[in-house]
Amino acid sequence: MEKYNQYKEAYPHKTDAQIIESLGWELSDKVETIHKLLPQTKVNRIWAMPNKLTFTIKPIKELVTRYVNGVVIDPFANESKFGTIRNDLNPAMDTHYHLDALAFLKLMETESADVVLYDPPYSITQAAQCYNEFGKEKLEQNVANMGYWANCKNEVARILKPNGICIICGWSSNGIGLKRGFEMMEILLVPHGGSKNDTIVTVERKSQTFLF
């Protein structure tokens, strides 16, 4: 960390990622330093009834409302109106586009979004509930394809402006991730009771381009 601080003082115009690369550190040293540079992550846990329309769940809706501003891109909008540019595979939804999410994200210009909302179906059951069997075959292929989700996250990293916000709803707190230059700001855990999985909401800020 001392070497990092010395380099930062000598080259104030360089980004954190550029400094870390210039120092030629091993991956483990990079990760350790990045963690020290990150702000503390705020974690909340609020119970709420489940709903297939994630952004209508009260604590999640309140969180999203705090962050949305400017150009808000939503590749899995369903009935949500938070996005200023919305996409949904189902043509019955009131969205601007009806494309596969990855194809939609690739249409967006680089560093054009202030916020990206990311709430895809993570299981075949979710896909059936959210899309009423529309595009079932394609959805099943995508849900089971981890490479597909990784490519979607790469596109999210590309289209967000520096300091842009990504809000992800899912079953893990992985988010977009450090390697894509994102720092975790907030995690919301929403338990639903019984045997239902918690909904985990991550809020990340784009601080750099890809780190490693």
What are these model-derived regions, one by one?
Residues 2-84, 195-198:
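S-adenosyl-L-methionine
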Residues 70-107, 125:
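SAM cofactor-binding core of SAM-dependent methyltransferases
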Residues 163-170:
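Conserved beta-strand signature within the Rossmann-like core of class I S-adenosyl-L-methionine
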Residues 174-212:
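Class I S-adenosyl-L-methionine
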